[in-house]
From Swiss-Prot:
<feature type="compositionally biased region" description="Basic and acidic residues">
    <location>
        <begin position="50"/>
        <end position="72"/>
    </location>
</feature>
<keyword id="KW-1133">Transmembrane helix</keyword>
<feature type="region of interest" description="Disordered">
    <location>
        <begin position="43"/>
        <end position="72"/>
    </location>
</feature>
<keyword id="KW-0811">Translocation</keyword>
<keyword id="KW-0813">Transport</keyword>
<keyword id="KW-1003">Cell membrane</keyword>
<dbReference type="Pfam" id="PF02416">
    <property type="entry name" value="TatA_B_E"/>
</dbReference>
<dbReference type="GO" id="GO:0008320">
    <property type="term" value="F:protein transmembrane transporter activity"/>
</dbReference>
<dbReference type="GO" id="GO:0033281">
    <property type="term" value="C:TAT protein transport complex"/>
</dbReference>
<feature type="transmembrane region" description="Helical">
    <location>
        <begin position="1"/>
        <end position="21"/>
    </location>
</feature>
<comment type="subunit">
    <text>The Tat system comprises two distinct complexes: a TatABC complex, containing multiple copies of TatA, TatB and TatC subunits, and a separate TatA complex, containing only TatA subunits. Substrates initially bind to the TatABC complex, which probably triggers association of the separate TatA complex to form the active translocon.</text>
</comment>
<keyword id="KW-0812">Transmembrane</keyword>
<keyword id="KW-0997">Cell inner membrane</keyword>
<keyword id="KW-0472">Membrane</keyword>
<dbReference type="InterPro" id="IPR006312">
    <property type="entry name" value="TatA/E"/>
</dbReference>
<comment type="function">
    <text>Part of the twin-arginine translocation (Tat) system that transports large folded proteins containing a characteristic twin-arginine motif in their signal peptide across membranes. TatA could form the protein-conducting channel of the Tat system.</text>
</comment>
<protein>
    <recommendedName>
        <fullName>Sec-independent protein translocase protein TatA</fullName>
    </recommendedName>
</protein>
Length: 72
């Protein structure tokens, strides 16, 4: 009941081959690889395009304490 035997894995493999066929599985794996490659390339492009920015602002006076008037 704990782990699957070799027969379980062979049956799963046979079902997958029947559903997808022999030629479809390599196509799916190629599409997954292309997706991963495009994702990595997009992340690298995003990092390269973004220039560091500075904030030009003046410091304001700190906010004074406000007395709470709510009743508990």
């Amino acid at each position: 009941m704990g782990s699957f035997s070799i027969w379980h894995w062979l049956i799963v493999l046979a079902v997958v081959l029947l559903l997808f066929g022999r030629g479809k599985i390599p196509e799916l794996m190629g599409d997954v690889a292309k997706g991963i490659k495009n994702f990595k390339q997009g992340m690298a492009d995003e990092d390269a395009k973004e220039d560091p920015r500075t904030i030009d602002a003046k410091a304001e006076e700190p906010v004074k304490d406000v007395k709470k008037t709510t009743k508990s």
